[in-house]
């Protein structure tokens, strides 16, 4: 009996000793854990302060963050995209930098040098900007009639050139000094007197010009008479002193023949006449 009690006492003593060791180790671990946490916080503070110091040293505009983030530095006259550090996409002066795809689809917002853009007007010229369904026309001295139909493009006329007309789906038009360039048919891109098309150009003292359906542009110089084209064809252009332009319903301009459109051949601003579905016309000397 005494041996059994002694044995139980020994087991109890061993159990208590083991429990005290476990508690001591746990307390020891709890005491050691806060130190690394403090060290980590100090490191984070050091990194944060270092980043602020780096950002304060630079003179440009930076966004400071952890490693792997982007830094943006803007320079005057350049367009910078989001890139990694030391990698910048810089545009040249006077050149249009467009990130990605144009969001303004259907609008002709273009910027460039006079030599590299067909939609930049020079001094003394008349520029036209066409948006879908809208025809905006502006004529300067030296140019005659100008017209375009809904859904057409932008037009540019320089000094001495005459009217320009585009049909839906066609592209831009550009006239040089003393000449007139017209192009564009339904559903096609820019057409400018290529082979296989009906491109007519009249020289001085020449007679009228007529385009059939699907033909491209027509151009007349000083001293030419009326110009006529049937529905489905493109624009007609004359120089100062030519007659007026008239459009029929659903077609482009028609000019210069009886039973089709009116004619007016006096110098000065030519007449403006619109029928349902046709485009407006404006002529100045």
Swiss-Prot record:
Glycoprotein as UniProt keyword: yes
Disulfide-bond pairs as recorded: none
Source lineage: Eukaryota, Metazoa, Chordata, Craniata, Vertebrata
Bias kind Low complexity: ranges: 115-128, 160-173, 186-220
Protein name stated in the entry: MARCO-like protein
Region entry Disordered, spans: 47-77, 91-285
Gene encoding the protein: MARCOL
Top-level taxon of the source organism: Eukaryota
Signal peptide (from-to): 1-20
Originating species: Homo sapiens (Human)
Compositional bias per record (Polar residues), positions renumbered to this chain: 57-67, 105-114, 134-145, 174-185, 221-285
